[in-house]
């Protein structure tokens, strides 16, 4: 399947709207009212207060498509893996659901909406670190969805830990 970026955005938006999510409009690439950073570096940036417990006016199920800028690996720009500006697509549950729904839904998006053969997928799980145990629940869910164990890779907090900084 060959898609234009506008088609991918539409498929992503439609999928999450069918799951009861509301779109959070993107914030500017140079964020206003955030003295902690020069640029918007992730889709979660504007949602930090909500991820910490503050209710969001649009509800508990959200998605966004956020222009993001990252410069921490700027010396590597130009290879096939590094960019400075990109659009980050994300869906968010603010205490409404967790892995048991999220992982099968994302698998559904990849395999049904984007027609990616499940046998071609590789996934990562958190191997544990920084006082946080291994994520065996995600491992079991991916395995149950048919992802072979040799395609489920475990990484520690140095390689597989999401943070605002990316």
Each language-model region and where it sits:
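Structured aminoacyl-transfer and RNA-binding surfaces used for tRNA recognition/handling
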Residues: 1-166
């Amino acid at each position: 399947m060959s898609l234009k970026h506008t088609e991918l955005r539409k498929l992503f938006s439609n999928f999450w709207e069918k799951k009861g999510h509301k779109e959070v409009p993107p914030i500017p690439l140079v964020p206003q009212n955030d003295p902690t950073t020069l640029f918007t570096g992730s889709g979660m940036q504007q949602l930090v207060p909500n991820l910490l417990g503050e209710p969001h006016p649009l509800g508990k199920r959200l998605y966004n498509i956020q222009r993001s800028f990252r410069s921490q690996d700027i010396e590597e720009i130009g290879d096939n893996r590094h960019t400075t500006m990109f659009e980050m697509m994300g869906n968010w549950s603010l205490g409404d659901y967790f892995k048991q729904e999220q992982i099968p839904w994302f698998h559904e998006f990849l395999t049904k909406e984007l027609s990616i053969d499940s046998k071609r997928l590789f996934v990562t799980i958190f191997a544990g670190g920084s006082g946080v145990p291994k994520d065996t629940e995600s491992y079991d869910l991916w395995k149950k969805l048919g992802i072979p164990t040799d395609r489920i890779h475990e990484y520690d907090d140095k390689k597989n830990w999401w943070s605002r900084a990316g």
